[in-house]
Amino acid sequence: MAGSPELVVLDPPWDKELAAGTESQALVSATPREDFRVRCTSKRAVTEMLQLCGRFVQKLGDALPEEIREPALRDAQWTFESAVQENISINGQAWQEASDNCFMDSDIKVLEDQFDEIIVDIATKRKQYPRKILECVIKTIKAKQEILKQYHPVVHPLDLKYDPDPAPHMENLKCRGETVAKEISEAMKSLPALIEQGEGFSQVLRMQPVIHLQRIHQEVFSSCHRKPDAKPENFITQIETTPTETASRKTSDMVLKRKQTKDCPQRKWYPLRPKKINLDT
C-alpha cells in the first residue's frame, strides 16, 4: 500500500544528553582519580615554610585599622595554613595522617657529623687514657710506699722486776719437783696392774663371741637330738668319805662316769672328757 502513512519515532534531545551524562560518570568512576596535591617529603619543612610565610601575612595587616586588625590577621593566617595543608601530601599521605618524625636531609647530615665526632673522640681517648691511667696507678703505688716508710708503730717498754733473792723460788721449784716425782713413781708402780687388767679384759672380750657361738650350737643340737629323761638312780654313786673327827684324811680321787649315749653329730663338736673331782678342796 503506497498511500499508507509511515510512523516515525523521534527521540527528544534531552534523553540523548542524559544518556551521555551517565556514560561520562561511569568512565570517571572506572578510571583512577588523579592526585593534584603538591607532593612533599617532610612535614617539618612545610611547617617551617608556613612560619616563614606567616610573617608576610602579618605585614599585610599593617594597612588595616586596629579594631579589625587582630581578628582579620588570625582568620587570614588560619585560612592560609588550611589551604596549604589541604593542597599538599606528605609521602602520599594527607597532612593529618603524616607523622612528624620524618627527618630532613640537613638533619641527617648533622647527625652523621655528630656521630663522626663521637667516633674520633672515643678513638682518641682509647689511645690517651690507658697511659694516663698507668701514670696514676704508678703514682698511687709510690705514695703508698712512702706512707708505709713513714709509719712507725709505738711500742711501750715493759718494766721487768728483778728479784735479788732467788732462794724462795728455788724452794718452791724443789717441792714441786719432788711431788711430781712421787706421782710418776706411783703411776709406774700401778702400770703393770693396769696392763694385766687390760689383758684380762681383752681376753674376756675375745672369748665372748666364742661362748655365744657355743651356746647357739648347744641350743641347735639339743633341739635336734633330745635325750630321754634319765632316772635319778643312774646319777647316784657311792662315795667313800672319812669322818671329820679323824686327824689324818686320805685324799681320794674318784671319776664320775656318765652314761654313755649313742654316737650323735654333736659329739664331733663337743667331745666329753672325764672330769676329776678332788675331794680335799
Swiss-Prot record:
Coiled coil: none
Entry-annotated residues carrying Phosphoserine: S4
Localisation: Nucleus; Chromosome, Centromere, Kinetochore
Residues recorded as bearing Phosphothreonine in the entry: T244
GO biological process, one term: mitotic sister chromatid segregation
Gene Ontology, cellular component aspect: cytosol; kinetochore; MIS12/MIND type complex; nuclear speck; nucleus; outer kinetochore; spindle pole
Principal cellular location given in the protein's record: nucleus
Pfam families from the UniProt entry: Mis14
Keyword Cell division: yes
Keywords of this entry: Cell cycle, Cell division, Centromere, Chromosome, Chromosome partition, Kinetochore, Mitosis, Nucleus, Phosphoprotein
Quaternary context: Component of the MIS12 complex composed of MIS12, DSN1, NSL1/DC8 and PMF1. Interacts with KNL1.
Role played: Part of the MIS12 complex which is required for normal chromosome alignment and segregation and kinetochore formation during mitosis.
Database matches in PANTHER family: KINETOCHORE-ASSOCIATED PROTEIN NSL1 HOMOLOG
Protein name (database record): Kinetochore-associated protein NSL1 homolog
Annotated gene: NSL1
